[in-house]
Amino acid sequence: MNHLYSKTNLEEMLEAGVHFGHQSHKWNPRMAPYIFSERKGVHIIDLIQTSNLLHEACDFLANAASNKKEFLLVGTKFQASDLIKSEALKSRCHYVNQRWLGGMLTNWMTIETRIQRLKNLETQEKLGAFHHLPKKDAAHLKRQLNQLQKYLGGMKYMKNLPDVVIIVDQQKEIIAVQECRVLGIPIIALVDTNCDPEIVDIPIPANDDARSSIRWILSKLTAAIRDNRF
């Protein structure tokens, strides 16, 4: 990493608030190697470590993208939801940004049938089929369509299990983490000072609550994917 890039990188991270962890009494001791100091009862993340691990993650994603791998972005907390969707769309990735439904990966065959149902309902609506049904039936199908779009819309074009999963807020998305571990799917995750870095493949120590921090990290990860797709 050249010195100028490293300096700019650190300045950008400071500006985005990437270094602010949680209150020190909420920490996970396994995050100790990634903590720089404590200030006014709040842990400060070591941004040199963040930078190094972010580079490792970007290299991994760039290589995966060049080999035509598929990616799933997961982040359902309100600070991350719209950022997950916009970054996923820009980089042609799949995403979950509303709620992780148990079994989304480990019960993939069932999820596949729900995705097919979503596509069928979208086709019916587009063709105007709902207009030919009794109002009650049409309203029921419309509600069903809205629900499926809300929870599965970001996975609509996912034909198989993803090759890599990127997660914002490991604690909130712990079920997604567990499913990936069961299936052996590599996980890249933002890990705040209250997280366990040992249960993901590439942990990126970072503030996972501030939108500015989430946006900054996500933009780097998805750029690595976008710039290396063919």
Curated annotation (Swiss-Prot):
Belongs to the universal ribosomal protein uS2 family. The keyword Chloroplast applies. HAMAP family: Ribosomal_uS2_B. It is found in: Plastid, Chloroplast. This is Small ribosomal subunit protein uS2c. The lineage of its organism: Eukaryota, Viridiplantae, Streptophyta, Charophyceae, Charales. The gene is rps2. One of its GO terms (cellular component) is chloroplast. Keywords: Chloroplast, Plastid, Ribonucleoprotein, Ribosomal protein. It comes from the Eukaryota. One of its GO terms (molecular function) is structural constituent of ribosome. GO terms for biological process: translation. NCBIfam families: rpsB_bact.
